[in-house]
């Protein structure tokens, strides 16, 4: 796999909008042509080379390209947006919308990611080794169709409304989450290995949420179905005992499932 290295010169106060940082756009271009790729700085069209040193070996196919961003890009948005193949490695933090609309390939962020990571994701893999902000794997504002495929893994904590309007795929949060994970969820799987503050699965109609930690406050619209051990969801087994709830029956005909670890959630057992 050919590696193209982007070294940030300086992160400006006004964020960069850089959906063109992806293998699909770099494919078939020389290093000089990559330097001249357009990105946005506020309302101004600028060149990638104005803000990044560019080096490495180009390739003709997106699937054969790995983009390495060798530094912190905390004020660069939309990296990897709509990408279909190849890899991106970010050796630092990223701003909003990393991997939004992603359809294939892999993005790895070694630091933190701000809100809307993996928004409207269709496929591929997004892995964040730090924390993520709000709306991981959510829908576009005003839409009712969120993430429908792919896998998002956050090794740290995440914020509010992860998996909002989720329609498929899988989200794994290895730390804690804030309020309303899985709100309006229709399909897919959310795994929370830490704790959740409140309103898990609010107005969900389908899909599955597994919480291995504590749910501090649970919604009343879920029907308690008892305790299950070593549950299996989509071919994946979760050892241990879980309280099983169906809902959210604030939605007519809801068939969503929430599993909460027995050892942490005696306070929500009916």
Curated annotation (Swiss-Prot):
Secretion signal, residue range per the UniProt entry: none
This enzyme's EC code(s): 1.2.7.12
Enzyme class: oxidoreductase
Superkingdom as given in the UniProt entry: Archaea
Activity regulation text: Not inactivated by cyanide.
Catalytic activity as recorded in UniProt: N-formylmethanofuran + 2 oxidized [2Fe-2S]-[ferredoxin] + H2O = methanofuran + 2 reduced [2Fe-2S]-[ferredoxin] + CO2 + H(+)
Record pathway: One-carbon metabolism; methanogenesis from CO(2); 5,10-methenyl-5,6,7,8-tetrahydromethanopterin from CO(2): step 1/3
7 X 13 AA repeats of [GW]-X-X-M-X-X-G-X-[IL]-X-[IV]-X-G, as annotated region: 80-213
One GO biological process term: methanogenesis, from carbon dioxide
Gene Ontology molecular function: any one: formylmethanofuran dehydrogenase activity
Factors inducing expression: By growth on tungsten or molybdenum under anaerobic conditions.
Subunit and partners: This enzyme is composed of seven subunits FwdA (65 kDa), FwdB (53 kDa), FwdC (31 kDa), FwdD (15 kDa), FwdE, FwdF and FwdG.
Family, similarity comment: Belongs to the FwdC/FmdC family.
Function according to Swiss-Prot or TrEMBL: Catalyzes the reversible oxidation of CO(2) and methanofuran (MFR) to N-formylmethanofuran (CHO-MFR). Can only oxidize formylmethanofuran. This enzyme is oxygen-labile.
Designated name of the protein: Tungsten-containing formylmethanofuran dehydrogenase 2 subunit C
Naturally occurring in which organism (per UniProt): Methanothermobacter thermautotrophicus (strain ATCC 29096 / DSM 1053 / JCM 10044 / NBRC 100330 / Delta H)
Species classification: Archaea, Methanobacteriati, Methanobacteriota, Methanomada group, Methanobacteria
């Amino acid at each position: 796999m050919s590696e193209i290295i982007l070294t940030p010169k300086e992160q400006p106060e006004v964020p960069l909008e850089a959906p063109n940082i992806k293998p699909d756009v770099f494919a078939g271009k020389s290093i000089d042509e990559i330097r001249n790729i357009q990105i946005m700085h506020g309302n101004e069209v600028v060149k990638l080379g104005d803000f990044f040193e560019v080096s490495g070996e180009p390739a003709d196919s997106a699937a054969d390209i790995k983009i390495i961003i060798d530094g912190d890009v905390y004020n660069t948005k939309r990296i990897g947006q709509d990408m279909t193949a190849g890899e991106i490695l970010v050796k630092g933090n990223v701003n909003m919308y990393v991997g939004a609309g992603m359809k294939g390939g892999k993005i790895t962020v070694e630091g933190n990611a701000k809100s809307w990571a993996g928004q409207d994701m269709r496929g591929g893999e997004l892995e964040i080794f730090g924390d993520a902000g709000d709306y991981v794997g959510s829908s576009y504002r005003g839409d009712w169709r969120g993430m429908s495929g792919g896998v998002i893994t956050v090794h740290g904590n995440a914020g509010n409304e992860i998996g909002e309007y989720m329609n498929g795929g899988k989200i794994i949060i290895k730390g804690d989450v804030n309020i309303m994970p899985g709100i309006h969820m229709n399909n897919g799987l959310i795994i929370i290995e830490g704790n959740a503050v409140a309103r898990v699965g609010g107005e969900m109609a389908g899909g599955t949420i597994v919480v291995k930690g504590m749910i501090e406050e649970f919604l009343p619209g879920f029907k308690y179905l008892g305790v299950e051990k070593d549950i299996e969801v989509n071919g994946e087994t979760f050892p241990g005992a879980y309280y099983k709830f169906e809902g959210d029956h604030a939605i007519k005909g809801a068939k969503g499932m929430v599993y909460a670890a027995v050892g942490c959630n005696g306070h929500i057992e009916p």
